[in-house]
Structure formats: C-alpha cells, structure tokens
C-alpha cells in the first residue's frame, strides 16, 4: 500500500513530524513518503494520505487547506488522516483546565472533516526557535517586540512517542484494510 504524507510547514517542525510518520509507516511495511503539499500535483498514485500542517492562531497553514480543497474528491475516496502541529510548551492543560491539544485544533478541521471524512485527526506540540528568520509581517513584528517574543516558550516540544504511536495506529488500520480499498 502506497501512502502519501503531505505537509505544509513554515519553519520545519511539521516537516519533522511528517518525516517521522512516513518513516514509521515504512517500518511497518507500507510504502510511505513525506512531501510538501506544494510538490504534490496528484494524489491518485496513493492508496492513503496523511495530511498535516502547522497551525498559527488556531488556523492551519493556507497551503494545507488549499491542497485539501483542491484534491477533495480524490482524498474523500481514500483513507485520510489529518494532523496539525503548533501548540508550544509542555503543559497538557491550560489555565482554565482545558486540554491544550484539543483546544488547539485548527478551525479548518470542521470544514475538512465534512469534505474529506478523515479516519482520524491529531494535534501535536510544535517547536519554536526565536532566532529563526521571521516569515511574514506578523513574525517580524513579534521579533521586534520583546514582550511578545518572550511570551512564546522557545524549544522543541514535539512528542515523538505520541507521533510514533499515532503512526502505528494508522499503519494497523491500513494493514487491516482489504486490498483494493
């Protein structure tokens, strides 16, 4: 079974997650490859798709959303999973007692759930390097505002065991698929 792990990233943390998922699927005996959404013109060669994107301010990166909308017919006809990376820090619960990963779900997932009927979705913690070159006006402004810059915890917060477990779950579901599905 051939699996595409397509992703949209801004600074590379989502690339790392996509590559880890593809490696885990490959280790489970599937043929998987991670590719940026901008490099994928056709999903027809793939039997299943895992689609991921970084999220900023509760919104998935536009290239991931555009990819999902553009390929919605083909994606809805095969097994699909969605993931997002973005929340920073190690706290699983926010100051209001809510699950950080659940409340960080990108707003676009509601629309994409209706369009694509994904088998699952997951939000993972992301990474932030305050010394990375800024992308876009918003990031340039944050870099020049010390209070805003210091409000974001710096570091790599990706939970590799959680990512591996999610990929293993996908692999198990795909291995249980009747061939030709």
Protein language model features and the residues they cover:
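General secondary-structure propensity
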Residues: 1-7, 148-153
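Conserved SAM/SAH-binding loop
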Residues: 37-39
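N-terminal beta1-alpha1 ligand-phosphate binding loop
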Residues: 2-28
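FMN-binding flavodoxin-like domain, especially the glycine-rich phosphate-binding loop
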Residues: 16, 24, 28, 33, ...
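Glycine-rich His-Gly loop
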Residues: 8-9, 53-54, 85
